[in-house]
Amino acid sequence: MFKRSFILIVLALALLLSACATPTPAAAPPAAPAAPANPVLRMSTTTSVNDSGLMAYLQPVFEADTGYKLEITSAGSGAAIEKGRTGDADILLVHSKAAEEEFTGEGFDEVRIPFMTNYFIVVGPEADPAGVKTAKTAAEAFKKIADASAPFITRGDKSGTNTKELAIWKAAGVDPEGQAWYTNIGAGMGQALTVASEQQAYTLSDKATFLAAKTDLALLLETADDMLNTYSVIAVGPKRFADTNAEGAKAFIDWLATDKAREMIAKFGVEQYGQALFYNMDK
């Protein structure tokens, strides 16, 4: 009896040791998303989300999560929207409300969703000869610049920022066209900031591109009530262009609404600049 019990104990120990020695199978890596039927998604963006680095930050994660491949072109919002109007983009990421509403009113869109914000800012020389720092609104700041005949750089490219700038001049009761102090460069935000820095001039910028540009200009006015900058994502409607990648556009819009994407947007810029560059809107 004792011998039989001893044998059973030995066998049990052997089985236990064998089980311990067998490595636990590693967890299988998450399966890659199924390849979309049309994997290429043509995106036309405003320069600010591209020049700030936001799209380079979001793109690889979106592609890994969905299987789509983004082909991104960037220009001022007016030119970016025009790509949707000609069928050369599946999805738009822009910030020019009037131009967006005109586009949707013409029946080119499938859906338009405002999804994030930041602020336009007035930047200029540290010495601030026009006294912009004391202004309470952008319109007041622009009036001070005009009254001082201080140099001002305008993008002049029909972008969202340029459209906003012209609206501010109108609100200020000033027509800057033809004035010696008003220089139209017909270029993007990065170039406008470079020229403004070289000439120690004022300009209107989005905050994200300004921080990324690292010029010697000073941030003189921000977060005024008339400086809010809203970004929208627009899916180009397949009713106008049969080859539009509507499924890919929907996938991007759905992905933007995920907690993962919203957290990425909320954190963008915090580590490098100590502050977020864009803010999610409520779902």
Where are these regions (language model features)?
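Serine endopeptidase catalytic core focused on the charge-relay Asp
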Residues: 122
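Exported/periplasmic ABC-transporter solute-binding proteins
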Residues: 21-23, 27-65, 69, 78, ...
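Bacterial N-terminal signal peptides that target proteins for export
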Residues: 1-9
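A short, structural micro-pattern
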Residues: 9, 116-117, 227
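C-terminal motif of bacterial Sec signal peptides marking the signal peptidase cleavage site
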Residues: 14-19
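Acidic, polar ligand-binding/catalytic clefts
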Residues: 91-117
